[in-house]
């Protein structure tokens, strides 16, 4: 049976991961540990003989830089890459920038867990016209309709922007038998996992995607999922 492989990788640890802050769409770079995680992921993929035909990532530099580091390890810096805001992390609204422990003190542990892990609960919207964390103030989103840009998202809303992009841009490569790498974020990857694994809301609540660890999906010639596993 012909098998096509997809590699999903959450970016390496970011500076705000290290500081235990909600990041969302804020464009924070990798920490030193995050760069090391990306290098390790690249070495693991090289050891396992991966050769990619196409790459995808978000428009946030912690994911972009992770992909660059991985491709450098593979000596595939030439790989065609498509960047899309639809692969961005879930927008955490007013939580963006807050330390998670401080947020728990303010809102309560159960509320924060619902905002973080549930499927359809939305954190408070970000507000303030001059707020540096508002997407409409960012030039990288200048050509995107303001109706499409979120001010906060649940995982459900994240899935609703990720999966149409998956179907339109990524699946055609898989159906051609091409090997794809996607470097994205915890919740955009959780959205893909939910879709591919047909998980219900309680099942996706339990899913946590580690930073910098390759998650492999194998597909048959009809692009049906055969199996998935982490490479460590």
Swiss-Prot record:
GO terms for molecular function: phosphoglycerate mutase activity. It catalyses: (2R)-2-phosphoglycerate = (2R)-3-phosphoglycerate. Pathway: Carbohydrate degradation; glycolysis; pyruvate from D-glyceraldehyde 3-phosphate: step 3/5. One of its GO terms (biological process) is glycolytic process. Homodimer. SMART domains: PGAM (SM00855). Its EC number is 5.4.2.11. InterPro entries: His_Pase_superF_clade-1, His_PPase_superfam, PG/BPGM_mutase_AS, Phosphogly_mut1. The record marks 185 as: Transition state stabilizer. The keyword Cell membrane does not apply. Keywords: Gluconeogenesis, Glycolysis, Isomerase. It holds the Pfam family His_Phos_1. It comes from Blochmanniella pennsylvanica (strain BPEN). Substrate binds at residues 10-17, 23-24, 62, 89-92, 100, 116-117, 186-187. This is 2,3-bisphosphoglycerate-dependent phosphoglycerate mutase. The active site is at 11 (tele-phosphohistidine intermediate), 89 (proton donor/acceptor). Belongs to the phosphoglycerate mutase family. BPG-dependent PGAM subfamily. Catalyzes the interconversion of 2-phosphoglycerate and 3-phosphoglycerate.
